Amino acid sequence: MKIKQSTFYAFRILYRIDKGKDRVVTSKEIAEKEGYSPGMILKILRVMGQNGIVRAHQGRGEAGGGFSLEKSIDEITFLEIIRIMEGVDISANLDETSREKHTRMFLTCIRMNEELELLLSQYTVRDLFESGETGSFLDAV
């Protein structure tokens, strides 16, 4: 499994919105701080909005629009973001209607998929941002 760049962007976008805590954060602000294209930011925010991760706020001028979290980063799991951004299914290329469905290869892929989902569901977005022995997600290695 190879995680797409846009999925990593999604995690960093959530970090920026979370840092805004008591206010909406604009896509322009996120783009400037992260160095990503505004179009890419909006595309990712749209996907996360459609899936209940962020909320879009309309507005102009002083009461400008932007984005806020729909739920806490303590509740948003890696699995949820990866599923939203790209899906998680190791066995996706095996056709369930064919003879592969009953092979050891297929059954092994199903089990691997279940274990991967279990692992990804154990980590939250907050886990990325907390400092530990190796630093936080945003620290340079």
Spans of model-derived segments:
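Short, hydrophobic-biased segments on the C-terminal half of alpha helices
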Residues: L14, L45-R46
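A short alpha-helical element within helix-turn-helix/winged-helix DNA-binding domains
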Residues: V25-G35
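Key DNA-contact positions within bacterial/archaeal DNA-binding proteins
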Residues: G39
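C-terminal regulatory/oligomerization modules of transcriptional regulators
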Residues: D95-V141
